[in-house]
């Protein structure tokens, strides 16, 4: 379980950012929630240092597993629990019974002790006891197997809340190796173990039953007993009846019939003698003779399951015409009542002696033969009268050839072959021979047909079957006494039979040889009263077919009294199965003939031979004989030694087992197997029931047929096995059998294993199709090679070939057996085996033709949040809608993630890897720590989902804020992020307007500056710094984290501060910073994302301190800090990665900048959403949602380019902290401002972005900070440091570049950032700030998807005027805005907003106007963006055509707040943002001049999406 959970957890972590890890996410669903409880700092740190996605996933899964409930045992479904309990008890009982069977069989006196079978019985019983705990555990508890745990594929989160739910591999490849995959996707564990236990219980029973039959403890007919006899009527038993009819036969038969009936009645009375005789008859019947008369042994037919006594006539499944040459009627005394006389057409011409001999032989043959036919010496065959009222069947009379033996042989063989023919006219003779079809089964109650052969006018009838040869001998002697003259014949017959049995033991070749010698022996047989009728013919025919050969070999007139001898003879010569024993019968007859011909052994000899035969053929003894044997063998109490003796003492067993239990179908073991296969065939296909009932039904149908194949295969194989074991003792002529007992059993077990494995092939097909559908509908996933889709087809082909090879020999033996005995279960076994193969081929042909299946799939949110088990493993996707403001991303995960991936041309891969590392690291760490306060779970998830930030432009590790003409690293990053978000590709054009590839900082850099707060080191520094600082530090990490925290946790404790001036804002920032650990976490993520992106993408992340013509780069994040802490703000944070600088600066700048910065991402949405100073909570919530969304996008972008940094930064600020510093940098990028929501970015706005932009950046400090931001760019740098969470952000450099051309401040000071929830178009990137036409063009490219409307309002704002540090000619901004299609302006705005207001501050007046109405509410560029957005309708043209009005969407598409006044008024708001194609998320009317482009740019495009959505909400 633990391993499974780990695997799924690993999948979840890696799938945290990916929609592909449905199982992982599902496993992580609760785990993620619980993980938020973990110390976020630890999580962040651990996530940072986890370099491998798999390792991070494992770590996350371990955390989740620990937090899931602390319990590794999860109960299965109720019905499964009861199934486990009941079947465990039942199988425990069967195992105990197996031990009892072992002891009971050990006490039986065996002629040939089955040591191997007994040992196997006790060993397998022990194995069952070992497997029972496994079965119970897997049935009652969840073990990570989909089918066993009752998990339905492609279901919602509610189905998959259990953390132990394995990874289903639908959304993404499952973790783990082949063994884990087999464990997860294999058949139901409990049912599989159940099947194994059932086979372990069933096989020993079969082995012992075969040995018992071999030893004669059970009648040979038991060979044909099956587990399905309670359902299927044995056809052979019906065949005799159908053939038998009233036989008006010669007077001879009637008297002899009377005598026979008398004898039979005596036998029926089951006197001791009669029993013995019956046993003898039974043995004779078991001889290989084709014709099994119903002589004394009654059970001559192997097919007849009934004991000889009880089913004398039934035994002949196939009735063979027996030829009787005896014409004397009075010799057929026996069988009058029970046997019908059939004219012996074959023997009519034979002399009475010959006839008598033939009759005796026939009787022996009859005993041996399937038919219980008594043949009168007169030439009539006496058929056992099953009903006794049934008329005797009249057989056409035909003259028998002079050679009764050869003719009789032929006739018998022919009759056996004919199985349905009553008579055969062999010669024209008055004597009649009765031919009964071997197909007929006699059901007469008499065990043996007693026929009287009167050679001298005396007729004797023997109707006894002897269990033991000795007993048989006795009975024979008595019979001989009764018979008088017939004794002689009987002796010969017995002798012959005895001789024959040895030959029986011989192989068919021996039998044939014997048959060949028959003619010579036949003569002797005639003398010995065995007619030569069968000798020659039988050798020929016997091989092919029937017990007739036996009758032919010794067409022993079945004398009622001599029957005993006859039976004994037959016992020696009769084959167990007439059907198989055709050849054997011939052999027997030849043997008997030879012996009888050569020497007419005395009865004693015959008895001895018979005894030998019986010993050789123990199975021949009917059940009744077995009883006598049983007492003999078990009379003495045997004390066992060793382990058996210990068990004997334990169970107190001192008596041998009653072998009768083996003949009572069905056995409990067989029922247990039925139950196991039923559960298997239903529960395995059930995994597809919710998603595709049609496929589940097809799957189940195939499995039901497979189960039938296993069940009926066992029935057929059991018959084969018993027959082969018996043949070892009593050689049976087996014309078609090519296997021995061991190989037969081994092949059956192998075929069973293949059939069970075949179900996995069908499952593989269905799972592959479903996984393809699940992944195809997720834009995030790339459709790659589908070559494996045909793997299932190849596997099915291999299965068919393997199963055909294994089953071919078995089917051959089954068909050969059925051909001889017409055994219905044998036929069904072969038929179902072939049908299964054909059905498999047909099903797979259909599956190959059917290209598409209709699968019912859950909603994407449900899939990712529920199936993934993490309720949206991606914070952006899930947080804004589900938990934090970034849930907009969560809900829009598919669309947003899709857009991001589609636009960024990065599928889940980046989100998975980045989100897994950053999301898991930051989400789990930051989410745990930061979100611990505000909703750690949401953030934790958000952190994972941050990967889906549209801003997947981490390709540029540098975050640049460039003004219109200037292409800066920050711009590259931002552009990359924006373009990824917008176009699905990263544009590294430095001239491009604002690149807020990094979530907050980078984007916030906007056109002017990008705080490079999110390099790996910077992120780590931020995280560390934020942790040092306290709540905000912990969650966000240094300065960036503070801003991002505020973004994530928009409402700092003092909501008024947001409305208030810088001090209030600073306080809020501090509070927000403190909140950062908790609520700001989401914003921290956003900022962090920005920072990370910035670090990865922009030079500004490096804290470049240089001013380009059109861009200003602040070496320290302090430059971008909101001016509120003047001291803090002025000190430009060194271009250190966020790690170093942010920590120092956060204290001073943190309070202010944290509030501002944190609010910047949140502030704008906050203002848009909540104009009240309560924006902290609402902003936190709303901004968290939107912020999270953009942050996630940014994180994705950031993570992709600089995965390590992102991981580190993300863990701290939940992917936002890195961005936060960046956000500080850019005012121009309102989107950056919004995304970063970093007040520092607002200060950076000093460098060129209106203060208002800064104000929106910071929630509380927005107004004051705007004013401060209005302060010289130095403040902006200071703000960069502190506003960007200098402590965190110092690592993040803010490059404030005018980007006059590329990012003219599309948002001139937007002092009145209208409180429009959508007002802050953080998506709007102030790409117009980029001075470089190239940047502009790239920005335009980014905004290609966006409607030109953003570029339409090209509000030229002299960013330079607003940001002294980032002076940028208005013309440049306009140019860039125009050149970039106003995409840069919007991009800058977004980046600025994302950056957290790091854009150059707007003029104080602008700031105050903007900040007062909006910054108070929004306290950051998001407000400005919102206003701009308000002015300009949000672009609905996202890369995926989705409109981002829902905060749940992560669309990081640069929300160009449509030419809303960009911080650079000359460019116009739209110009600043139009570059972001993804901006359509929502175009918030932006106040062209009300908010500075710095605010816009400060909101990263990603953040913009979040903030805008938040504002919209």
UniProtKB/Swiss-Prot annotation:
Protein name: Protein tincar
Topological domains annotated Extracellular: 99-120, 203-668, 718-736, 809-826
Bias type Low complexity, positions: 427-466, 879-903, 1060-1071, 1179-1208, 1255-1285
Keywords for the protein's UniProt record, in alphabetical order: Developmental protein, Differentiation, Membrane, Transmembrane, Transmembrane helix
TM annotation in the entry: 78-98, 121-141, 182-202, 669-689, 697-717, 737-757, 788-808, 827-847
Example of a GO cellular component annotation carried by this entry: membrane
Biased composition regions of type Basic and acidic residues, renumbered to the chain: 523-532, 1286-1296
Cytoplasmic membrane side: 1-77, 142-181, 690-696, 758-787, 848-1513
Chain spans, region Disordered: 247-266, 354-373, 383-532, 879-913, 1045-1090, 1115-1155, 1173-1214, 1231-1335
Membrane topology according to the record: Multi-pass membrane protein
InterPro entries: Ommatidial_diff-associated
Tissue specificity note: Expression varies in tissues throughout development. At stage 5, expressed in the embryo dorsal region followed by expression in a striped pattern at stage 6. During gastrulation, expressed in ventral region and ventral nerve cord. Also detected in many neurons in the externa sensilla and chordotonal organ. At stage 16, expressed on the surface of the midgut. Additionally, expressed in a subset of cardioblasts (Tin+ subpopulation) during dorsal vessel formation. In third-instar larval tissues, expressed in the eye and antennal disks.
Gene that encodes the chain: tinc
Listed Basic residues bias regions: 478-507
Polar residues bias: start-end ranges: 1324-1335
Cellular localisation: Membrane
GO BP annotations, alphabetical order: cell differentiation; regulation of eye photoreceptor cell development
Function of the protein: Involved in eye morphogenesis. May be essential for the normal differentiation of ommatidial cells.
Entry keyword annotation includes Transmembrane helix: yes
Bias-annotated ranges (Pro residues): 1122-1149, 1303-1314
